Amino acid sequence: MLNIMEVHETNQMIEQEKLDVRTITMGISLLDCASDDVDKTCDNIYRKITTYAKDLVSTGKAIERDYGIPIVNKRITVTPISLVGASSCKTSEDFVKIAHALDKAAKEVGVDLIGGYSALVSKSMTPAEELLIRSLPQALSETDIVCSSVNVGSTKTGIDMNAVELLGHIIKDVAERTADNDSYGCVKFVAFCNVPDDNPFMAGGFHGVTEGDAVINVGVSGPGVVSRALDAAKGKDFEFLCETIKRTAFKITRVGQLVAQEASRRLGIPFGIIDLSLAPTPAVGDSVGEVLEKIGLEQVGAPGTTAALAMLNDQVKKGGIMASSYVGGLSGAFIPVSEDKNMIDAASSDCLTIEKLEAMTCVCSVGLDMIAIPGDTSASTISGLIADEAAIGMVNQKTTAVRVIPVAGKGVGEMANFGGLMGYAPIMPVNQTSCEAFVTRGGRIPAPIHSFKN
């Protein structure tokens, strides 16, 4: 039974502590849109998206109005396009046509982003998958809200180093093509290991082939709420601290569950999952970094940061999992540098380095996320960063990812501005010692011994 204090507490979370639902994401299967003609495939895709998602934005706004819960983004994910376009796309330009169809359909229904211009190549690349990857510079520079991801490895299959090596060059090319906008195209691309099928967050979201025809997935956000709750834990022991985070995560997730079920009911589309992730914004008081500092660090990046993040991540999961009937996606704590005020400050003061961020990715939701690096960073160095993160994910049986932005024409100490939720970031130094002989060997890194479970 709810009591009036709990109602007041929820209102306070929304009004003062920046609690919001980060995204309602509709996943749509496009497998039935495939044909042997690329123009027909584009027409099928446009028609299906605009039919299924026509009421998504208006429904999100209605739920916002009825419940007083801010819903920041409405998004769409689709089946990986390398699968949908495999029969009809004979060139990279054919895949770019599909990217334009996605962009047009997403704008027509009014969503903020559409994800799924993706390829799953954890073991090897088909010709169609390689064509899609090679189309990324043109596709991401010519479209506005299309997001892309490539899964380069998994615990079961190992790491496809051919794809990893290729992506270093692709990311550099995307950066050059969008140089006039601080290489913004790279913001819309992420390389994964162990990618989930039901991620509502961008840029890594797509509608997995194991999913049904359509689904509603919701991502919540609440680092500001956790931060405020931790004011009461100052000077207390770890038991009290963990209990505080856990209880707060439960309340945050319960709001997401309500929104997800209501959106599912109103749209007539099944509810999929709640992603428990604490997703920061560049606004003051909405920072995962601030939470870590309230746990007891002088600044993010100090010794103890990885342990504090591990504890935070675990308690968020323990609290959130009780609040939702289905939990999925990435679910934990995000550490995107450009989207988190306290992490921006820590990176600017050199307290937070890429090497420390890599250590933090061993215990949190994702990986090296929204990190601006010098524009003259070599393709092989970027491939090396992707390989390192993929190895962490592969060996530890967790999702890891890399979203780095080699900002064309800028160097260490300068600032890159991506705008809106994507924020801004100082250009961080990268170890430039060459790994080219390693990443260009060709082939794949085998799966680890503990992957053999049968």
UniProtKB/Swiss-Prot annotation:
Pfam families, per the entry: DUF711
HAMAP family: UPF0210 (MF_01221)
Protein's name according to its UniProt entry: UPF0210 protein BL1209
Family: Belongs to the UPF0210 family.
SUBUNIT field: Homodimer.
InterPro entries: UPF0210
Cited CDD domains: RNR_PFL_like_DUF711
